[in-house]
Amino acid sequence: MPGLRVLLASSEVAGFAKTGGLADVAAALPRALSRLGNQVAIAMPLYAAIRRSNIPIERTNVVLPVPMGPRVLACRLYRSQLANSEVPVYLIEHEPYYDRDNPREGRGLYQQQSGGNRTDYADNAERFVFFSRAVMELVPHLGFTPDVIH
C-alpha cells in the first residue's frame, strides 16, 4: 500500500528558523514520515534570518496570488530541502510580513523589543492568515495532491 502524501505547514522549522519546540517537531516529524515511506513536503515563511544564513534556497518562477479579503496579495515561492532527508521545503516570500526579523535590532519572528519589553507584532494574525492562505495556493504546485495538510 502506498504511503500518505503529507504537506506540513509550520511557522518555523529547525534548521531554517526556530524560537521553540515547534520548530523541532516541524523538522523531526516530516523526516520520520518520509522514512516510513510517505511523500512529505513542508511549507513555511521565508524569513530574513533564512536569507542571511548559509541555507541553500532556490528561487522558483512561481508567484502565487493570495486572496486576503477584498485584496489579492502576491508571494514568491522558494524551495530548499530539509537537512538529512529527501523532504522539500517550500518557502513563502512576502517581504512586508516576513522580512523583519533581526536579532541585533531586537526583532524576532513574532515579537519586537519595545523599550524594555517584548511585544507581539500588531499584524501577527494577518501575517499568519496570509501564510495559511498561501499554503492553500501552493498545493497545485507541489507535484502531488496531499492526503493530509497539517
What are these model-derived regions, one by one?
Residues 1-19, 44-46:
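Nucleotide-activated donor-dependent transferases that construct or modify glycoconjugates
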Residues 5, 147-148:
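Structural motif
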Residues 15-23, 120-124:
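Alpha-helix N-cap/helix-initiation motif
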Residues 7, 41-43, 90-92:
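Hydrophobic/aromatic beta-strand patches that form the interior of the parallel beta-sheet core
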Residues 22-32:
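Short amphipathic alpha-helix
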Residues 38-40, 89, 146-147:
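Hydrophobic anchor at the start of a short beta-strand
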Residues 1, 46-142:
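A conserved catalytic-core segment of Leloir-type glycosyltransferases
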